[in-house]
A protein has these predicted regions:
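N-terminal hydrophobic/helix-forming segments and targeting peptides
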Residues: 1-208
């Protein structure tokens, strides 16, 4: 069971990947997908799953012989992280950082000095129509570096973090670096100019 959990976590770098993985597991277990816009035909003994916006999922089973009560179990599909803003590249001297905002209640210091990458959802232009495509860059792209203690003597004393000042992830040198959205496009196997919008988040490359 622990191996299955670690495999699921590794395959779920964003909320969209997590929902897709749970949906696939439920389909394998015999659940039927329902669409919110359709008229539902619910049958006794049936097992059903409904998703919304690719980021939320509800599954339920109907007993064969009615029932006098029901049980509910709930969990988050998402987790605290940093969301990448539109037009994210910020030049900072010889470096390029990405403009991000905090998402959820996180312990910010735990994101520092770790190998980070990017995953999420793209809205793309495809044959004259809008399409959604999940993307997860399989490789370390970013790091949020901490500074040496002689540059921040108060780091161990009730430290508070400012995302825009202290926690913008470092992407690389400004000279010769492939544009960030070009890397995302290549990973998703689409053209950068066909990406119309995105919901992209940082994820840790540390297993588990």
């Amino acid at each position: 069971m622990s191996r299955d959990l670690l495999h699921f976590i590794a395959k779920s770098p964003s909320v969209f990947h997590a929902v897709r993985g749970v949906k696939a597991a439920l389909a394998y277990a015999g659940f039927t997908e329902l669409r919110e816009e359709d008229t539902w035909q619910i049958e006794k003994g049936g097992k059903y799953v409904v998703t919304r916006d690719g980021s939320a999922l509800v599954a339920f089973a109907v007993p064969e012989n009615g029932g006098e009560f029901f049980r509910i179990a709930a969990a988050h599909c998402d987790s605290p992280t940093f969301k990448i803003k539109e037009n994210p590249e910020i030049k900072d001297g010889p470096y390029v950082r990405l403009n991000v905002e905090g998402y959820g209640g996180m312990i910010m210091s735990t994101w520092m000095d770790r190998p980070l990458s990017v995953a999420g959802r793209l809205i793309t232009r495809e044959n004259g129509h809008l399409a959604q495509k999940l993307v997860a860059v399989d490789g370390t792209m970013l790091v949020i570096p901490s500074v040496a203690i002689h540059m921040d003597r108060q780091v161990n004393q009730n430290k508070s973090w400012n995302v825009q000042k202290d926690l913008l992830p470092l992407y690389g040198l400004s000279s010769g670096k492939t544009p960030f959205m070009d890397v995302i496009a290549a990973s998703a196997k689409v053209k950068a100019e066909d990406i119309l919008a995105h919901d992209l988040y940082l994820y840790s490359r540390v297993p588990g």
